[in-house]
């Protein structure tokens, strides 16, 4: 049996050089859990109609600045209204810049390495091995009617799992086990519509993230035949006919876009003038310097080759042609915002917003052509890790409404925040904090695992530290000499182009951030469930 306390003591004694090793060892415990969920979750309360309704709105790959309140060029009137009536956490980050680990972190309130789910290729945890109740199950036990529409992306598995607390569960496509546990699939209920969508996107490449997927088009497929359109329409039908008047509602509406491919209904494309769209700024260098992203290119040839394809295509485009991608990305955000508005209107008509918490977030960001025409995520720079986190609704204290909170915040904070509002037991081991309470994160944490050894981020409003090992995982010894780093002063260098890590002038702040990162890892994994050997 692994002696975790000994590991933590050793890490503190040996300094930050061991922080990466600590987290890797912690990840190995991701499938060792207590025999009884009650050991860490405690008792949950029963339902009651006086509890606030919880409306959880989510997208995929939406940058922190892809909402109108942070970017006047983008049109998201419904999210902007929620921000004016709530609180926007503008320094929030995800816990991993890819779908599966980020979404599991959200649903369990735990870091990806605590769960052992660190990449999109990670296998989903089987139901008997869950560390605690996922968020929908926690709320179901607390007396909520639970309805989930759209993407969860638990991960791949060969074994069937349940709906994990969702009494109603609808998704747009089965997609090789990524959406397990649903009760309604577009594949089964609208195969012709899904086939039409797949025909339109057939040349978009894996994950719809090839060159054609990012160039995008004005879609000729009817809205409902899109996977997000199908999910939205099923959600709106449920809000008309499926609400239980005797129970509070937990509604989860989660879209696949604005993730590429960027095939968007024409009326939303027409909302934008390409002359108003900014061109993406590029760094003063052509080759990625000695960064965790450069090392990722060396070890992951799929990502490196895809970047070469994007670079070859976008470097030959005119300015207006490059802007077209950003326009389609913005239009995607506007389309989803419109669906959110329709859902909120039905909830308001049903009286469900008189006592409600409304949450909006995304799983990670999008590079959108930055750093020499890179797209998707898969790195620890702000365009990839910063996300919109927005709390609105009647339960938000009046003094917070219309405010922007610039304290560090994390995606895992949403689990304890929602649990507190719902009157159920907070997950005691969660690294997250109640965002509506007096939360006091020193910084925000994100981890990135790819083909090589991992990289870890510690971020404050002003500074960002990234530590990584430029060796394949099976070759890394995790000595201090092998650890490399990046340090950025975000206020003067928001694009993160000037690495200050080796600059002696910034040695003091570099070491302070290292200490804070190590403290966060030590405290997090010392509180992790260890199970029986």
What is each stretch, according to the model?
Residues 491:
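Residues forming the ATP-binding cleft of Hanks-type serine/threonine protein kinase domains
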Residues 2-479, 484, 494-515, 519, ...:
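Formylglycine-dependent sulfatase
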Residues 487-488:
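Short hydrophobic beta-strand that contains or immediately precedes a catalytic carboxylate
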């Amino acid at each position: 049996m692994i002696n975790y306390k000994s590991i933590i003591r050793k890490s503190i004694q040996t300094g930050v050089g061991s922080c990466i090793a600590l987290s890797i060892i912690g990840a190995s415990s991701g499938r060792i859990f207590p025999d009884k969920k009650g050991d860490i979750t405690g008792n949950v309360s029963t339902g009651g109609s006086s509890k606030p309704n919880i409306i959880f709105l989510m997208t995929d790959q939406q940058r922190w600045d892809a909402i109108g309140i942070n970017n006047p060029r983008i049109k998201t009137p419904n999210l902007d209204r929620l921000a004016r009536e709530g609180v926007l956490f503008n320094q929030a980050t995800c816990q991993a810049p890819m779908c599966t680990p980020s979404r599991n972190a959200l649903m369990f309130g735990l870091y990806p390495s605590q769960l052992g789910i660190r990449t999109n290729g990670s296998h989903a945890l089987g139901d008997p091995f869950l560390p605690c109740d996922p968020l929908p199950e926690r709320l179901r036990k607390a007396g909520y009617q639970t309805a989930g529409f759209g993407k969860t992306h638990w991960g791949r598995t060969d074994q069937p799992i349940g709906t994990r607390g969702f009494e109603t569960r609808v998704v747009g496509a089965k997609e090789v086990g990524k959406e397990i546990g649903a009760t309604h699939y577009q594949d089964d209920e609208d195969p012709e519509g899904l086939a039409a969508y797949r025909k339109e996107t057939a040349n978009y490449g894996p994950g719809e993230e090839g060159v054609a997927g990012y160039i995008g088009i004005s879609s000729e497929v009817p809205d409902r035949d899109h996977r997000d359109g199908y999910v939205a329409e099923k959600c709106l039908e449920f809000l008309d006919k499926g609400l239980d008047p005797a129970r509070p509602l937990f509604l989860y509406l989660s879209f696949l876009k604005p993730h590429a491919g960027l095939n968007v209904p024409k009326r939303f494309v027409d909302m934008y003038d390409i002359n108003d769209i900014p061109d993406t700024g590029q760094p003063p260098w052509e080759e990625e310097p000695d960064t965790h992203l450069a090392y990722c290119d060396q070890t992951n040839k799929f990502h490196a080759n895809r970047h070469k394809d994007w670079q070859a295509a976008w470097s030959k485009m005119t300015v207006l042609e490059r802007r077209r991608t950003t326009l389609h990305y913005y239009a995607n955000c506007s389309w989803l915002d419109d669906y959110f508005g329709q859902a909120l209107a039905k909830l308001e008509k049903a009286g469900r917003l008189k006592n409600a918490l409304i949450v909006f977030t995304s799983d990670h960001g999008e590079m959108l052509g930055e750093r020499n025409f890179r797209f998707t995520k898969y790195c620890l720079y702000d365009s990839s890790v910063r996300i919109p986190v927005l709390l609105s609704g009647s339960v938000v204290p009046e003094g917070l409404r219309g405010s922007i909170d610039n304290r560090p915040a994390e995606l895992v904070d949403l689990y304890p925040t929602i649990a507190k509002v719902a009157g159920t037991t907070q997950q005691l081991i969660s690294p997250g904090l109640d965002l509506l309470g007096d939360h006091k994160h020193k910084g925000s944490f994100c981890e990135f695992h790819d083909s090589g050894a991992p990289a870890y981020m510690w971020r404050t409003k002003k500074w960002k530290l990234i530590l990584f090992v430029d060796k394949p995982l099976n070759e890394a010894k995790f000595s201090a000499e092998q650890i490399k780093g990046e340090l950025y002063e975000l206020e003067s260098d928001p694009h993160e182009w000037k690495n200050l890590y080796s600059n002696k002038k910034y040695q003091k702040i570099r070491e302070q951030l290292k200490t804070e990162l190590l403290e966060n890892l030590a405290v997090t994994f010392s509180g992790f469930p260890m199970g029986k050997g």
